[in-house]
């Protein structure tokens, strides 16, 4: 991706409108996970060091175009100040006279957090008037919100019509890592696709079948493939309207010389709970009133072996219902295999896979954890992301 980044422009004394992703989970006004704030720190620190006037914009939650008290960015600005070790000001508006006055009072290296951009109905409609208001605050637009890059909103894309537009360091790294995986991967290249539904991963599987050497299938979506092979799957998740597509994907893999791995055994249960009784059965032996909830031990070994012998692995979606202890072993085993693999570059595609490696304490062993669930999925599907397309070319 040959897009300009903050390293390619002069920032000293410039007012920089930097779109970050501070959409953090909150409980009773407290931030429960600050990963996204920490992920933006290198960009913010770089802007500060370069003597820019740093104006940060983000959304939080889904206020649907109106001010919602508990979705104000005030606690986020306070925590950011602690992490940066400096005074961070907070505006109660995202544009207009109040924001303009606060920007006018800024010195080089100052940091100001604007109010939640989704308090304004024009944000999600990519309204040109709102984009102009944002642009009026600054000299340069920096997009560092990879997590929102698949959205064509006023603060992620529209503003780029009115200002020079470059990526932040986080956005730059995401584009570099994901771009290299798709255009020039080290081989063997393995994709692990899990999660509940085939329909959410159709574009991903189709696009990756042209790129990968190995495709590993797990999670709830695997049972549609199992049924497509003619096996009974009991009460397991299945999308009957996707069975023909599953057959087509398996055929395509064969034609393209892609090794297609599916579960050979599964963990089954009669009840969905933390204390559930489970059994392990072969993939062709699921009883009628039981459901598959995780990949079995033989499958884990096979998958771990493929991972160990890969140079690049992209993982999108868990292998089972990892939120519940009895059904978490498959997802944990894939994470462990990635953590232990030597010389394997691991890319975790945001969302549930990222949550899983966090939960199992393996995050620091992964090469790259994407900060965008939906954005990384769309990027890996080969789609153009509005928040990236709008940036200036090198």
Curated annotation (Swiss-Prot):
Superkingdom assignment: Bacteria
Catalytic activity: (2R)-3-phosphoglycerate + ATP = (2R)-3-phospho-glyceroyl phosphate + ADP
UniProt KW ATP-binding keyword: yes
Chain positions with Phosphoserine modification: 183
Gene3D superfamilies: Phosphoglycerate kinase, N-terminal domain
Pathway assigned in UniProt: Carbohydrate degradation; glycolysis; pyruvate from D-glyceraldehyde 3-phosphate: step 2/5
InterPro entries: Phosphoglycerate_kinase (IPR001576), Phosphoglycerate_kinase_CS (IPR015911), Phosphoglycerate_kinase_N (IPR015824), Phosphoglycerate_kinase_sf (IPR036043)
EC number: 2.7.2.3
Binding of substrate, residues: 21-23, 36, 59-62, 118, 151
GO MF assignments: ADP binding; ATP binding; phosphoglycerate kinase activity
PROSITE patterns named among the record's database cross-references: PGLYCERATE_KINASE
Any one of the GO BP annotations: glycolytic process
Keywords, alphabetical: ATP-binding, Cytoplasm, Glycolysis, Kinase, Nucleotide-binding, Phosphoprotein, Transferase
Location within or outside the cell: Cytoplasm
GO cellular component, one term: cytosol
Post-translational modification Phosphothreonine, affected residues: 299
EC top class, as a word: transferase
Principal subcellular localisation of the protein: cytoplasm
Subunit structure: Monomer.
Family statement drawn from the similarity comment of this UniProt entry: Belongs to the phosphoglycerate kinase family.
Name the UniProt record assigns to this protein: Phosphoglycerate kinase
Lineage: Bacteria, Bacillati, Bacillota, Bacilli, Bacillales
